[in-house]
């Protein structure tokens, strides 16, 4: 941020558009381009404008951390502002921020209107959180019939590899 990157870019929606457009042009057509943003830098007054710049630039999915840079990681997360963004863009929006429990996930989905979540610090403190959310909110087994984690989200995303498989490769 001291060098104008990261969340500082949220002060310059046109720069966000330029960057995502360049990534979209450089990436193979079959490879999805996604972006992650906070609600803003000092405040959330440009949140929708930034989200539209990212979507118009070619992002096919947008993750929104429901706080500004100035908010840092202090509660609360403003999930209802994620809903404002979701309604303003024509790409899938994923809610992120302050999801520590299944109940938090439920409240986040309701307030944001999103169909999916990105977990951050909550999954570090509870590594089983994603599986608990999948089971409790969506009634899904953590694995499909072939024992693989089902892929959700953007089409053409790389396959999900179970952690146990990754450990055998180390």
Range-by-range predicted roles:
Residues 1-4, 65, 127, 132:
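Active-site-proximal loop/short-helix segments
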Residues 1-16, 67-78, 141-142:
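Glycine-rich tight-turn/loop motif centered on a GG-T
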Residues 1-48, 52-57:
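Active-site entrance/lid segments in N-terminal catalytic domains of soluble metabolic enzymes
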Residues 26-28, 32, 44-61, 73, ...:
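Alpha/beta catalytic cores of nucleotide-metabolism and tRNA/nucleoside-modifying enzymes
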Residues 36-38, 65, 96:
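Structural motif
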